[in-house]
């Protein structure tokens, strides 16, 4: 029998008061593709109004999944973990969906907004882990001594200045997925080749052609199918929001970006020239002429420690809610 004040009692009370022990989304351990898959399926089972589908599987068989909530006319897409060592953005998206779903089920609020109003107004499509192969390498789910680890290490040996595996951003074929989109891809190739990234490796290799990787093809196809009003592409780090495509500014994008900056405390900034080509946000703005944002969450050196998650979530919750609703007219 538990006595008042014991550790067991405190743990039980924590469960009964819906603390972190009851949460489906783990925010205390590194994210892996298997944990992401398990989490999404548990969320869909717990909240039947959530939907999921597999967009593709990677060259090594890992699924790239969506997780969707809402039935509103305004469609938005939030993506995360385009880069392997930026995996902390995956639980950011998953936790947001979990808290929104719980608030919908309990007729509650999220960030001061009635949750049911959010899902009536918007349909929020998310791709929580664009690069599951790379994430598994960085987080240790691909163990030393395995064929996949050895193959990645051989590619990494071409770039000895990049720490392995923590410096890995690419997929396991050594292609940087956020340099795969047809928005100045040839210019991106020129820039990255001039920097020495001429062959597959841990980061910054653009591939042999735009959209020639399963993951980037799947996200581009999905985006064209959904035809969203807005996209958020989550990366780390720097506490910066990038909002335009070179000199082109989508009407209304700055005002919404300024609101994101106000809510998060992040800086709204122009994308540095050498990083202005072939990214997902760049392609979306070029093709759709609608607001797209790359958000560099958190601060420090990638991969960011999981201990930084509470701050990242707190800073970005307002962005995630506001992007779904847009600015008041």
Regions of interest found by a model, annotated:
Residues 75-77, 293:
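Conserved beta-strand elements of the Class I
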Residues 83:
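Conserved phosphate/anionic-ligand binding catalytic regions in large, soluble enzymes, centered on
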Residues 73, 88, 95-97, 101-242, ...:
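Active-site/substrate-binding loop(s) of hydrolase catalytic cores
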